[in-house]
Regions:
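Exported/periplasmic ABC-transporter solute-binding proteins
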Residues: 1-86, 91-108, 114-126, 131-136, ...
């Protein structure tokens, strides 16, 4: 039998979008409008739990901050909601989720925007589906002119070099760097030159700019923020590419709001590209359990 859907539309041009969207959320909330529709023999579509001003908790890998900060602010204003974003290395974010181990904890994120695919499987039970938004390559940033003539990952093991990397337990970039070094049998040689091991890549950019390091392994998007002072050498390795997935928690009481945030981010492609990310054209949702992850980056699942 044919069914018609009852929809509510809010104009892009609306000067009071927050009030209009609040009303739409009210109409759809299970304990508000949906209950009335059900009484009137409509088949209610389950909406988000009612709140005057919902608070959406987003966990995001640090690499995404320059591309999304403005978009998150605009989304919160248009929707009349609060978006509480925790930016950190994905190792730290996953560990925090695993430590909470209970999605009823109000601090457990409603949405998760990782630095790379390899940090989704550890929490796939809560985030069984992801949309791949962007990618960025991993390379070596050096002072302008490349005074030490660094060309490859192997060159980081050269004599008297001061190298900076990210911590493998705390960050995606560190984890992926360690994976590439191990896979290339360079771990011992490069490890001997490491003078800085930090949780986020922006700290490495600051350190190389002060002259305390000769070379740092970072994402291209990190380098872009300081490209007038630095040169960037792409690493020739199949693992030197990070893909950023966005996932909404399957049991979030703000699941629809999380999906609206994703749609809002997808409308702002130009911002991601301006920050140096490459946009992924096919953004169909992928099951987290089916993400293709290189064998050297596979991690134990959440217990």
């Amino acid at each position: 039998s044919h069914k018609d859907k009852v929809t509510v539309s809010v104009l892009d041009a609306s000067s009071s979008s927050a009030s209009a969207l609040k009303f739409a959320r009210y109409l759809n909330a299970p304990e508000k409008g949906s209950a009335v529709f059900t009484e009137m023999k409509f088949e209610a579509i389950e909406g988000d739990e009612w709140a005057e001003k919902p608070v959406l908790v987003l966990y995001s890998g640090g690499v995404n901050r320059p591309a999304v900060s403005e978009t998150l602010e605009e989304f919160a204003i248009r929707e009349g909601v609060a978006v509480e974003t925790v930016f950190n290395g994905c190792g730290v974010l996953c560990a925090a989720m695993q430590a909470m181990n209970d999605t009823s904890n109000p601090r457990f994120p409603d949405a998760y925007y990782a630095c790379d695919l390899c940090f989704v499987p550890p929490v796939e039970e809560s985030f069984p589906e992801a949309v791949l938004l962007t990618e960025t390559v991993i390379g070596i940033a050096v002072p302008k002119g490349n005074p030490k003539n660094i060309r490859t990952l192997a060159d980081l093991g050269g004599p008297e070099l001061k190298v900076g990397i990210n911590n493998a337990q705390q960050s995606t970039l560190g984890f992926m760097t360690a994976g590439m070094l191990k896979q290339s049998a360079l771990e011992k040689a490069v490890r001997g030159n490491v003078r800085a091991e930090v949780p986020t890549a922006d700290l490495l950019i600051n350190q190389i700019r002060t002259g305390s390091l000769d070379a740092v392994v970072v994402y291209e998007v990190n380098y872009k923020l300081a490209e007038e002072y630095l040169d960037f050498i792409r690493i020739d390795h199949e693992g030197a590419r990070a893909v950023q997935p966005f996932a909404v928690r399957v049991d979030s009481p703000r699941r629809l709001l999380g999906q609206r945030l994703l749609a809002f981010m997808q409308k702002n492609r130009a911002r991601f590209e301006a920050s140096g990310f490459t946009w992924i054209e096919n953004q169909r949702p992928v099951k987290s359990s089916e993400l293709e992850i290189p064998p050297w980056l596979i991690q134990p699942k959440k217990q």
